[in-house]
Amino acid sequence: MPNLLEKTRKITSILQRSVDSLETELPYNTMASRLADIIDCNACIINGGGTLLGYAMKYKTNTDRVEEFFEAKQFPDTYVKAASRVYDTEANLSVENELTIFPVESKDTYPGGLTTIAPIYGGGMRLGSLIIWRNDNEFSDDDLILVEISSTVVGIQLLNLQTENLEDTIRKQTAVNMAINTLSYSEMKAVAAILGELDGNEGRLTASVIADRIGITRSVIVNALRKLESAGIIESRSLGMKGTYLKVINEGIFAKLKEF
């Protein structure tokens, strides 16, 4: 049996994973799975708004309502608000407690069900909650030490992800600003008309038709598209007589055009 030190090392090793290695749909599934294996429980991670970031069901609970939460990737508002008022780890909560993850209809099935909730902090901010539970068997002091360490590790990873997202947003906005600054008034007019033709972020367009409608030459549209493509704002592909296929890959351009 791994001792407390070995389990602690397994948890802290999670920090060696880069943010880029996180899954897109549920970024913390692997992390929740590792925590569930180490602490021997079911586990889930939610952000401050109750959105499910990852979960692992080591033990089947057979509760349809809980599984519906996982499928919807969203916990109920009432539960999220109650969890947000937990400022320190609340351990071994019974099925009678409002913070139990066991629905009321499963109390008779799992009378010994126990839930532990640990707040997740990062950079002095509340980022979410780590929720673990068992159908029976209390979480020991060693388990709770691991829970405290786990919530800290998850908080660091969440903060890293937020930082990565912020840096990505800044990079994209800078690219948009630089691209816009290279456009003439006519080219800006052309870009606004072109993107207005798209169905969402992509679509097919015919440059000559747009040029005639807004009173500019086709070459202005071609130049505008080249500038946006070279800046990494759009991708385009010629469809021959059918026109041009266009896809926006930096959505910051839409917000910038609203200022035009």
UniProtKB/Swiss-Prot annotation:
One of its GO terms (cellular component) is cytoplasm. The keyword Repressor applies. Disulfide bonds: none annotated. It is found in: Cytoplasm. Keywords: Cytoplasm, DNA-binding, Repressor, Transcription, Transcription regulation. PANTHER family: GLOBAL TRANSCRIPTIONAL REGULATOR CODY, GTP-SENSING TRANSCRIPTIONAL PLEIOTROPIC REPRESSOR CODY. Belongs to the CodY family. This is Global transcriptional regulator CodY. Residues 207-226 bind DNA. The keyword Transcription regulation applies. Its main location: cytoplasm. GO terms for biological process: negative regulation of DNA-templated transcription. GO terms for molecular function: DNA binding; DNA-binding transcription factor activity; GTP binding. The gene is codY. It comes from the Bacteria. DNA-binding global transcriptional regulator which is involved in the adaptive response to starvation and acts by directly or indirectly controlling the expression of numerous genes in response to nutrient availability. During rapid exponential growth, CodY is highly active and represses genes whose products allow adaptation to nutrient depletion. Residues 1-159 are annotated as: GAF domain. InterPro entries: ArsR-like_HTH, CodY, GAF-like_dom_sf, GTP_trans_reg_CodY_C, Transc_reg_CodY_N, WH-like_DNA-bd_sf, WH_DNA-bd_sf.
